Curated annotation (Swiss-Prot):
Name recorded for this polypeptide: A-type ATP synthase subunit B
PANTHER family in the cross-refs: V-TYPE PROTON ATPASE SUBUNIT B
Alphabetized InterPro entries for the sequence: ATP-synt_VA_C, ATPase_a/bsu_AS, ATPase_F1/V1/A1_a/bsu_N, ATPase_F1/V1/A1_a/bsu_N_sf, ATPase_F1/V1/A1_a/bsu_nucl-bd, P-loop_NTPase, V-ATPase_su_B/beta
Keywords: ATP synthesis, Cell membrane, Hydrogen ion transport, Ion transport, Membrane, Transport
Lineage, opening ranks: Archaea, Nitrososphaerota, Candidatus Cenarchaeales, Candidatus Cenarchaeaceae, Candidatus Cenarchaeum
Function: Component of the A-type ATP synthase that produces ATP from ADP in the presence of a proton gradient across the membrane. The B chain is a regulatory subunit.
Keyword DNA-binding: no
Organism from which the protein derives: Cenarchaeum symbiosum (strain A)
Amino acid sequence: MTVEGGVQYSRIAEIKGPLVIVDGVENAAFDELVEIETNEGGRRLGKVLEIGNGKAIVQVFEGTTGLSVAGTNARFVGKVMEMPVSREVLGRIFDGLGRPKDKLPDPIADKFIDINGEAMNPEQREYPKDFIQTGVSAIDGIMTLVRGQKLPIFSGSGMSHNILAAQIARQASVVGTGDDFAVVFAAIGVQYSEAEYFRRSLEESGALKRSVLFLNLANDPAIERIITPRVALTVAEYLAFDLGMHVLVILTDMTNYAEALREISAAREEVPGRKGYPGYLYTDLSTIYERAGRLVGRKGSVTQVPILTMPSDDITHPIPDLTGYITEGQVVLGRDLFRQGVYPPVNILMSLSRLMKDGIGEGRTREDHQEISNQNYDAYSRAQEVRALAGIVGKAGLTDIDLRYMGVGDSLEQRLLTQATDENRTIEETLGIMWDTVSGLPKNELTKVKDKYVEKFYKGSA
């Protein structure tokens, strides 16, 4: 991407980390696009982070490696960074800055859109509703994803979140309607092998035809990670609000995004906040997460599933902590379940979807969905208590009902949580398994479900 025109300056005062400080600047604007010309004639893009006292601090997307103060020029082009968009972006693969990575020509643009997006008027926001089927029972059954929601996945280093992300991207759909559905997948700071896995997974399954894939690799400049989720969401907003599609945006790994933000903050010598992250981390994350939603009078929707790895599996770390304040629930992957070979290792007791009630029930999934979900959650919680008790007194000290709850816990992990990476379960199959699980209990223990549903769906003998 090159840009023409603008005002050129050759007085580069300093190069510090990913930043270039330009002297003698007049009439520059915050977030303005800047083209850096190197000694060898190469060009790199950047944007203005700060202006004042005749100086401009420019963040260079491709990094400053190889740049020198002498011979480097900066051209301020008078506009912000924009992403060219059209229906032709579907089925395409781009790098973290939105440039084609699949050896195909640039898609013909219908329009160019500011990557920072337009703020959604709160009065024009429509409440998220309607079910998105991921084909993953743990999510569909107990922490349902709703159109327009932002539901993060909290994972840990080395766990199976990338496999789960790819499975959701392949399988997700809106059921019972003829509405168009698309997936925008942004991989942020991932290894080459992970990027190839995402690409092959979408291509071989045929899901790439309805998807847009952005790949920012670990060896790309960290600064590029700040741009990747924004170009991805710009495409998603165009598909949703201009073309009327329901769009699922998967962002992985947002921890790499936050690390890049910390790197830039340190280079600017800003006063650090918790664990060295900038004090505006919450505000910055909200500019990404709040781009999910639905608008009154618009057919489409943007739903987000951001994925982040919790450093040291610490859910109180600033990144998951602040993410939880902005988003509407969380899906937490458990290390213990992962070690036991459960996939996906969803810890349902630490997970929830705050908007689940608005996307399920009669006319959306099934009339008993909420109650059987509550019953499974309650039974699993009781099973965990019984397991802890058995660790102290042994199985011989347990009552018959305790043993049945322990069996329900095992069944839930082995049948409801565990599924193959290519297994796409319908909501009917998921609800059937949930009834199979609690049918290991006597009817009088099913206190979260109405009697009429017990009579209709219960599969036990008593």
